[in-house]
């Protein structure tokens, strides 16, 4: 018997099985439970006892219980799908939410999760114990319950994973007199018929849900639809915005999803720290993004977006949640597109295909100051052209829909558990308290929460096991964040992934806003799962091309590292993902958004490395290191939050 086997057997004899409570059976909870259940096959530990507690009667979370008619995903199936369970090829790139719920149900079947999911079970309270945590829960009336006061039960466990979701506690902004009008939170709207017949509908907010609901309203039997916003919005199409040329050449209706089109090589992978931490990277992408929009639609604010432009310092993609639903945009633009001769010529030569709205429009207005006793709206003064029509009318809405988001709050946690702002390890747990993990509570500026939740789950489970089984885990999973690595993994360093604070708004502080590609890559570096160029080169052209020219798909980080799944990950990289990455998105997009940034950052990277090499030759090693890296740690969770 080898020495390693002897050590493993000795460690195994001292191990005690651990119990973990997963709160929530949405995408984040399911993928967390899956990795907890798979830990034995990867690390040789004892089976982990996992229980998933879900308040509703099925899995899916927000995608099943807080959706509306015609809702569909704003992230593509290529990015959204978990690394080892892919969406069938015959389904559309952007899944209707019903299909995504079926996907999650299939995930439960594939990884044998149904037996550990307890539906219709609400978490009442979670408290600390001497050795871990105690979860108090209550099952819905009619279900078999234990004999206890009010049907309340409890379960002691070693760790908890809070996966209750971002969209859990509705937030409705205070407006004086709102009680004088009928109003609903967006989570209460399910279908067009709720808008009524010959009614005036007001939508508060301009996020993705607001856009979808405004579209439902304007295509319903409502008489009037008004959309109110505070500071504007930045619309970004889900697919590459290819224009119609000379009103003759029309692009293929099936276009490349934007979230698959980011070349990660020299964007995250192998970009020197000095460049990655500088403002240059964001500045280039901000300008190329806006240039692409202008070329294809005549306005930098968004593709054919003539209302709601964000003004001042905030108008930068490094500080925004981009709105990826553009269904309402044609109706918002109605009557607002410029009609001067230059604009007409430009639109004739090249423009996004315009949808026929049959004259129906959505009015825009500033955020209401108040609602009078009779229900009429009091607006602030505004000189903006887009607000003229709404402010010239007496607006008396029959229904106000507050698409104003949700609050990050965990009322079931006792005092002593961290607040959202205190999760100072990648927004997942509070340092020194790894037994309480929070999965799925970061929000990307453009991207998707489920794939980030998968990477968070991988990192959290890995560190939980290191905490519980330090000897056993030392044999199986080197700690990349402490400099332990292997030749196939890129050495650990710190990425700048936080959205920036601009114009008095800080989405990183208030909503844990991150840049998808950078945050995903940081988690991969933390685990030692980011493969090197030399490793990818050995996997063949298709895998190398997908790694370099595609986004940071989670499957990319299953090729090496503690959760290595090379046998399954390589075919996905060479097949499904290669097939979408190889699409150029059209010459204008490829040149503007991919080729030019790649050439720029490639040239700067070569220059920095050449300069650093010369400095090393003359014995100035410290100066050489400073040439490539700033030595500064970017803004992190817990920094002045």
Predicted regions and their residues:
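Generic alpha-helical secondary structure signal
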Residues: 74-77, 431
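Hydrophobic membrane-spanning alpha-helices of multi-pass integral membrane proteins
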Residues: 498-500
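Flavin (primarily FAD) cofactor-binding/catalytic cores of flavoenzymes
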Residues: 2-70, 86-491, 502-641
């Amino acid at each position: 018997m080898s020495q390693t086997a002897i050590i493993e057997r000795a460690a195994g004899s001292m191990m005690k099985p651990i119990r973990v409570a997963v709160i929530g059976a949405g995408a984040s909870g399911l993928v967390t439970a899956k990795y907890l259940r798979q830990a034995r096959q990867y690390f040789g530990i004892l089976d982990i006892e996992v229980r998933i507690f879900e308040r509703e009667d099925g899995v899916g979370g927000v995608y099943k219980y807080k959706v509306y008619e015609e809702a569909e995903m704003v992230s593509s199936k290529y990015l959204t799908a978990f690394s080892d369970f892919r969406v069938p090829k015959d389904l559309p790139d952007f899944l209707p939410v019903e299909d995504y719920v079926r996907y999650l149900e299939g995930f439960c079947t594939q990884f044998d999760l149904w037996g550990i999911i307890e539906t219709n079970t609400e978490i009442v309270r979670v408290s600390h114990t001497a050795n871990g945590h105690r979860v108090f829960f209550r099952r819905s009336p009619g279900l078999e319950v234990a004999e206890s006061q009010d049907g309340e039960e409890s379960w002691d466990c070693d760790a908890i994973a809070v996966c209750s979701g971002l969209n859990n506690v509705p937030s409705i902004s205070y407006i004086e007199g709102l009680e004088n009008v009928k109003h609903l939170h967006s989570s209460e709207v399910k279908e067009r018929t709720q808008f009524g017949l010959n009614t005036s509908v007001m939508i508060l907010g301009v996020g993705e849900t607001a856009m979808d609901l405004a579209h439902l309203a304007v295509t319903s039997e409502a008489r009037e639809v008004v959309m109110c916003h505070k500071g504007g919005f930045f619309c970004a199409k889900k697919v590459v915005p290819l224009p119609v040329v000379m009103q003759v050449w029309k692009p293929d209706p099936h276009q490349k999803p934007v979230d698959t089109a980011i070349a990660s090589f020299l964007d995250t992978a192998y970009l020197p720290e000095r460049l990655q931490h500088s403002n240059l990277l964001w500045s280039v992408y901000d300008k190329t993004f806006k240039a692409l929009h202008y070329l294809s639609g005549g306005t930098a604010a968004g593709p054919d977006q003539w209302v709601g432009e964000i003004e001042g310092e905030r108008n930068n993609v490094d500080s925004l949640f981009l709105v990826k639903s553009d269904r309402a945009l044609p109706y918002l633009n109605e009557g607002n597109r410029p009609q001067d001769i230059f604009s007409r010529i430009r639109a004739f030569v090249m423009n996004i295909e315009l949808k026929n709205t049959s004259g129906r429009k959505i009015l825009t207005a500033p955020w209401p100051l108040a609602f009078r006793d009779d229900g009429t709206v009091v607006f602030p003064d505004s000189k903006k052209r887009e607000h003229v029509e709404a402010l010239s009318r007496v607006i008396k809405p029959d229904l106000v829909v507050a698409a104003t988001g949700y609050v990050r709050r965990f009322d079931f946690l006792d005092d002593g558990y961290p607040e959202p702002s205190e999760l100072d390890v990648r927004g997942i747990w509070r340092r020194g308290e790894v037994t309480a993990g929070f999965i799925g509570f970061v929000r990307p500026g453009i991207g998707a929460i489920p794939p980030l939740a998968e990477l968070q789950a991988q990192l959290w489970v890995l560190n939980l096991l290191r905490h519980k089984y330090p000897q056993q885990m030392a044999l199986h999973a080197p700690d990349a964040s402490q400099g332990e690595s292997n030749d196939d993994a890129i050495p650990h360093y710190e990425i700048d992934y936080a959205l920036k604070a601009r114009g008095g708004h800080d989405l990183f502080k208030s909503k844990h806003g991150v840049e998808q590609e950078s945050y995903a890559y940081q988690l991969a570096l933390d685990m030692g799962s980011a493969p090197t160029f030399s490793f990818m080169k050995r996997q063949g052209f298709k895998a190398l091309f997908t790694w370099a020219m595609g986004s940071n798909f989670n499957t990319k980080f299953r090729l090496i590292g503690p959760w290595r799944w090379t046998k399954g990950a390589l075919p996905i990289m060479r097949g499904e993902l290669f097939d979408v990455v190889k699409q150029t998105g059209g010459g204008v997009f490829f040149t503007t958004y991919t080729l030019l940034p790649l050439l720029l950052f490639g040239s700067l990277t070569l220059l920095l490395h050449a300069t650093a090499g010369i400095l090393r030759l003359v014995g100035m090693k410290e100066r050489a290191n400073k040439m490539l890296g700033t030595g500064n740690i970017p803004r992190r969770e817990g920094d002045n939050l």
